[in-house]
From Swiss-Prot:
<feature type="disulfide bond">
    <location>
        <begin position="65"/>
        <end position="91"/>
    </location>
</feature>
<dbReference type="GO" id="GO:0042802">
    <property type="term" value="F:identical protein binding"/>
</dbReference>
<dbReference type="GO" id="GO:0019864">
    <property type="term" value="F:IgG binding"/>
</dbReference>
<keyword id="KW-0732">Signal</keyword>
<feature type="modified residue" description="Pyrrolidone carboxylic acid">
    <location>
        <position position="29"/>
    </location>
</feature>
<dbReference type="GO" id="GO:0005576">
    <property type="term" value="C:extracellular region"/>
</dbReference>
<feature type="disulfide bond">
    <location>
        <begin position="89"/>
        <end position="123"/>
    </location>
</feature>
<dbReference type="InterPro" id="IPR014756">
    <property type="entry name" value="Ig_E-set"/>
</dbReference>
<dbReference type="GO" id="GO:0005615">
    <property type="term" value="C:extracellular space"/>
</dbReference>
<dbReference type="GO" id="GO:0002682">
    <property type="term" value="P:regulation of immune system process"/>
</dbReference>
<dbReference type="GO" id="GO:0070233">
    <property type="term" value="P:negative regulation of T cell apoptotic process"/>
</dbReference>
<dbReference type="GO" id="GO:0010628">
    <property type="term" value="P:positive regulation of gene expression"/>
</dbReference>
<dbReference type="GO" id="GO:0006508">
    <property type="term" value="P:proteolysis"/>
</dbReference>
<comment type="subunit">
    <text>Monomer. Interacts with AZGP1.</text>
</comment>
<keyword id="KW-0964">Secreted</keyword>
<protein>
    <recommendedName>
        <fullName>Prolactin-inducible protein</fullName>
    </recommendedName>
</protein>
<dbReference type="GO" id="GO:0004190">
    <property type="term" value="F:aspartic-type endopeptidase activity"/>
</dbReference>
Length: 146
C-alpha cells in the first residue's frame, strides 16, 4: 500500500512539467490562422466626376483553398464598373487583387465585401472549404469629393 501511495504522489518536478505542458498548449491554441486578410485601397479625396480606382487585395493563411466572391457596396448609386462582382479561388500561395473603376460627384461610403461561398467549377477539382464561424468579411472607407 505504501508503494502505491508513492507512485500516485505528485512530485514538484511532475507538477512543473504539467504546468509547462498546459502553458504550451494554450500558446498553440492562440496561433490560429486568419481566414481572410484584406487590404482595401481607394483615394481619400477626388474631384467631381474624376475616375476612381478601388483596389482590393485578398489573401488567406488557411492551408485549404476557398471560393470567394468580392464586390463593392456604396451609400449612393455609382457609375462605371462599380457593380462588377468577381469570383475566384483563393489559396494561401495565390493571393488575389481586384480592381474597380467608377465615377462619383458626391462623397460616398464604400464597403469592400468578401464572401466565402460554395460554388463548383472555380477551384481545381472543386476542392475548397467554407469556414463555419464567418463567411463574410468587409471593410468600409469614405471617399470625399471636393
Amino acid at each position: 500500500m505504501r508503494l502505491l501511495q508513492l507512485l500516485f504522489r505528485a512530485s514538484p518536478a511532475t507538477l512543473l512539467l504539467v504546468l509547462c505542458l498546459q502553458l504550451g498548449a494554450n500558446k498553440a491554441q492562440d496561433n490560429t490562422r486568419k481566414i481572410i486578410i484584406k487590404n482595401f485601397d481607394i483615394p481619400k479625396s477626388v474631384r467631381p466626376n474624376d475616375e476612381v480606382t478601388a483596389v482590393l487585395a485578398v489573401q488567406t493563411e488557411l492551408k485549404e483553398c476557398m471560393v470567394v466572391k468580392t464586390y463593392l457596396i456604396s451609400s449612393i448609386p455609382l457609375q462605371g464598373a462599380f457593380n462588377y462582382k468577381y469570383t475566384a479561388c483563393l489559396c494561401d500561395d495565390n493571393p488575389k487583387t481586384f480592381y474597380w473603376d467608377f465615377y462619383t460627384n458626391r462623397t460616398v461610403q464604400i464597403a469592400a465585401v468578401v464572401d466565402v461561398i460554395r460554388e463548383l467549377g472555380i477551384c481545381p477539382d472543386d476542392a475548397a472549404v467554407i469556414p463555419i464561424k464567418n463567411n463574410r468579411f468587409y471593410t468600409i472607407e469614405i471617399l470625399k469629393v471636393e
